[in-house]
Amino acid sequence: MAQDPRTWRWMRQNGHESRDEFHRWWEGVDLGFAHHLDGKLVGHTSFLNDRPEDRVVEIGNTWLHPSAWGTGANTEAKYLLLKHAIEDGGYLRVEFKTDAANERSRPALLGVGAQFEGIARKHMLVRGGQRRDSAWYAVIDDDWPAAKASLERRLGYGPP
C-alpha cells in the first residue's frame, strides 16, 4: 500500500519505504483516522489546523490507496469527520485544501457538500521544491443539514 506511487501523487511526502517508517509517521499524527476495506488499511485522513477559538478546523492529509478509489471509503470518512466536527465539536467551519490540479479530489470535495472558495496561488511548497496552487473548499454549519442528508442517502444510512 505505502509503496504504490499513485497513493502519494498529491502528497507532500513520498510515501514510506518500510512498515517501520510508516509506523513512525503514524505515531506522529495528532488525530488520524484509518480507512479500512476488507480488513486492510487503505488510507488515512485527519483533523489539522484546529482553531477552536474561531470554531474552525481542517480535514486533510488524506491519502487513499488506488484499490479503494471509488469504494465510498473516503466519502464515509469525510461524512464521519464532518459530523463529528460540526455536531459534536460545535465547529462552524470545516476547511479542505487540495492541489488545484488534483482532478480526483476536487469533485470528491464537492460531492461531500463542500463549497469551492477559490485558488490560493503558490500556496505551499511540495516535493521537488515546487510551489503548489491550492484549491480551497469549506462546509459551514449552515451547509451541513443539506450536505448531511445528501451524504446519508449516498451512503445508504437511514431511509431513502
Regions found by a protein language model. Give the residues of each.
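Conserved GNAT acetyl-CoA-binding A-motif
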Residues: 87-97
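Conserved catalytic-core motifs of GNAT/GCN5-like acyltransferases
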Residues: 97, 115-130
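GNAT-family acyltransferases
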Residues: 1-71, 84-88, 128-160
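Short His-Asn-centered micro-motif
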Residues: 60, 98-99
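Conserved acetyl-CoA-binding loop-helix of GNAT-fold acetyltransferases
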Residues: 70-85, 103, 107
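Conserved active-site alpha-helix within GNAT-family acetyltransferase domains
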Residues: 102-118
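Amphipathic alpha-helical recognition patches that constitute DNA-binding helices
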Residues: 58, 76, 93, 104, ...
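Short secondary-structure capping/turn micro-motifs that flank functional sites
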Residues: 17, 101-102, 125-126
